[in-house]
C-alpha cells in the first residue's frame, strides 16, 4: 500500500513545525505491519530528507521505518541517475537536495560560483525563494538545463485548510519566463508510481494508493493501474469525491481510514476492493480500461 501523508495520515501547520495525527492512522499502520502487508508513505513534501521525515512520523506514534518514507526527491535522485544528470541546480531548502547528494549528484545553489554546464534545475520546498533565485534558474534553463519539480500541485492540506504549494508558484514563473517543459517527480507522476512499486517489489495492480486529492493520489493510481482509494480527511469532501469525473474518481471512498483493513490481503494475494459496496472484479477492470482510454 502507498499512503499519502498530509491530509491522509496527519495534518501539519503551514511551517511544517507541528503535526496532528488523523483518526485511525496509528491503528491502520500498526495493523498492516502485524499482518505483514507492505506499505510506504509517499509525500509530495520535499522540505525534509526521507529519514528525517520518517523520524517525525515515529515521534507521532506512526510505525514508519526510514526506508518506508519516500519524497519527490527520492524519485528525482533515482531519475537523475538513470538519465545521467550529474549537476543539478536546486531551488529549495537544505532537505530538498539531500537525497540527490546521497546518490552522488552534485547539487548547486543559486549564487554559488559554478564552472561547467548545469544539467537540470530541480524545484522543491522553497518558502524563501527570491527573484535572484528565479533568475539563476532561468539562466540555467536557457543554457540547456532541463526543468524538474518535486510537485506541481496548487494546494495541500494543513490544519489551517488548503495551503498553496511553493514549487507550483515557482515553476509557474519559470515556465512563463522560459517556455520550458517541466517534469514532475512527485505525485501524480508515473515516475513516482513506478518508483514506489519498485520499492515495494510489487506490480502496480497489486498496490492500493490512499490519499485525499483527486488530482494527486487518485490520478497517479489511475495512470499507473493501481487501486485508488479516497479519504475525506484532507482537501476533498465526500460530496466532492462524488462529483469527480471518472479519471479522478477513486474506486473506494473511505468513511474512516480504518475501513481499509476490511479489504487488504497479504503479499502474493493482491489488494481487493471486495468488501462492502465494492464493485465486481470484471466491472473494476472494465472501468480501468475505460478510464485509461479517456486519459
Task: Give each language-model segment a name.
Residues 1-37, 51-67, 77-294:
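Asp-based, Mg2+/Mn2+-dependent phosphohydrolase catalytic module
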Residues 46-49:
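Canonical radical SAM enzyme core domain
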